[in-house]
């Protein structure tokens, strides 16, 4: 077959497939243009899930009449002029492809008027021909009317889902944009019915109300405010306490310089931060804003601009893990408060806090200090209140200023022991154990290089490894908490992490898992009856223990029952 050049119409329709996947893609691109044009109010009207009509009106800067034709051409943009401009890009759009791609697969009309202009102008794309702009009455700003999406590409149109499904995708797009542009007012109508109206939010309370309307009341009730800066990176936003988790990762919003992204590195880093407190199979919830020098992040990875590439991904990963871990650690049982900015130094390699028991360490006792004699102290001084009694040797009943607190004795003691063991390990170091039969491993060239580069890291992780020829190593000692039968796979997995990501957390996770198991077995088990003084000591330990609201497996350690809840149940005051 001969090579032939595609005509412009075919080439544009093929290229449009990268930008316009469904009606929601159109809404995203056009709203981003409105935001870049400094619009303070954006209205979106949808008919039949966007397949029939998408109409977006804004009060932004508008487009000069002489630029209207150029606006519908591919690779025409006002955002950048040369490749170097991408190093300092601050706008959401910059590729100059959106309008051209949309007009290639729809019937598009654009009307715009600039501030102080006597009239607006309208331009249409009919049968793939851009018409001459004509005068048209229009307020300041721009209106883009997109009708019959994919009318000329039947193969694409038949893959559209139901109008209800397509509309839900549109709604999610608007919610994502609304979460990063609080001062902009958003209105969404579907089939002439108002669905969303986010008013401009210029105060913290207004922004929190917008977040609550999107992520829900329960999220905000469990949310921790975070503001953390270090080494040129800043992370702001809200993370849910570890006790609030989801069965799906549907409440995870991460923005890089105001742009919503789906980035595996970022998602994995945030999940790693929750690793020590997350119940198996559950997902954390958060809305976070990462600010970074534009020169250190490449947003020109994919036409949809959902993906980014960091110049130093390890730097970003370590920062995110440390910031979120610090925030979660400062959340104490019974206390809800915003978290102050932290600038503490940290070691990104050792910050995973490997935590086995020291060699010869026995079970830690429940009460480390003699408690003060129990008195009727003012309740609010202690968030978990004061012990009243114990139920069947399992649950501790406590009273605080809100009402009744029920504590799972085993789960609470388990977390207390676990955190104390981790702290003790960090202070004293790892216990190592010699192998009866050293393990010989044959490595490929990449693995050999990774091991030679990270010998010191393996030593810190509790391994004694030596070279055994040009392509082999021999493992002689290992962390005492790890079983020898799994060491070969673990070391290979660690080397794979180092090759791919230049970092690893596998050993720390394995050690922490072993330590969590030890803490679980060492903790008080039901039925075990405590004195009031012992219950008091347990409550005070919980209040000062990191992640004291969750056991080592991510289950809650306590539950608050407010007086109002009890009054409602018993029909008091009715």
Swiss-Prot record:
GO terms for cellular component: mismatch repair complex. It holds the Pfam family HATPase_c_3. It comes from the Bacteria. InterPro entries: DNA_mismatch_repair_CS (IPR014762), DNA_mismatch_repair_MutL (IPR020667), DNA_mismatch_S5_2-like (IPR013507), HATPase_C_sf (IPR036890), MutL/Mlh/PMS (IPR002099), MutL/Mlh/Pms-like (IPR038973), MutL_C (IPR014790), MutL_C_dimsub (IPR042120). One of its GO terms (molecular function) is ATP hydrolysis activity. One of its GO terms (biological process) is mismatch repair. Keywords: DNA damage, DNA repair. Belongs to the DNA mismatch repair MutL/HexB family. This protein is involved in the repair of mismatches in DNA. It is required for dam-dependent methyl-directed DNA mismatch repair. May act as a 'molecular matchmaker', a protein that promotes the formation of a stable complex between two or more DNA-binding proteins in an ATP-dependent manner without itself being part of a final effector complex. HAMAP family: DNA_mis_repair. NCBIfam families: mutl. This is DNA mismatch repair protein MutL. The lineage of its organism: Bacteria, Pseudomonadati, Pseudomonadota, Gammaproteobacteria, Legionellales.
